């Protein structure tokens, strides 16, 4: 069972991280705690406005989520991504775990 966006937004486990520049939101990350994965974190959305892509906002949000995972003593962060984003998430410390119906299932594990 995967958390849907609607379930996550209505959940007390929802995590929303925002990146702003000059008061405007330029990127956001939405994640949730998945009770079926021992409370690991699941990234549901990571979006950066096109004009701000390639400037490190996504990486900053992922780093903040990793810090939060460590603080909350979570073992892992999971994300499903498309093939064209594999190298991006690999650079962020995620590894390819399996193919899924939503792309490639990737995981970052706390050390």
Locations of the language-model features?
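Residue-level recognition of the GNAT/N-acetyltransferase active site
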Residues: 49, 53, 82
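Conserved GNAT acetyl-CoA-binding A-motif
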Residues: 69-81
């Amino acid at each position: 069972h995967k958390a849907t966006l609607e379930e996550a937004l209505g959940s007390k486990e929802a995590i929303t991280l925002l990146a702003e520049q000059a008061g405007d939101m330029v990127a956001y990350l939405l994640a949730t705690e998945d009770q079926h994965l021992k409370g690991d974190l699941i990234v549901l959305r990571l979006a950066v406005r096109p004009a701000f892509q390639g400037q490190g906002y996504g990486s900053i949000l992922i780093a903040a989520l990793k810090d939060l995972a460590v603080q909350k003593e979570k073992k892992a962060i999971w994300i499903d991504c498309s093939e064209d984003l594999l190298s991006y998430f690999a650079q962020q410390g995620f590894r390819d775990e399996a193919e899924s119906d939503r792309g490639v299932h990737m995981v970052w594990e706390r050390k």
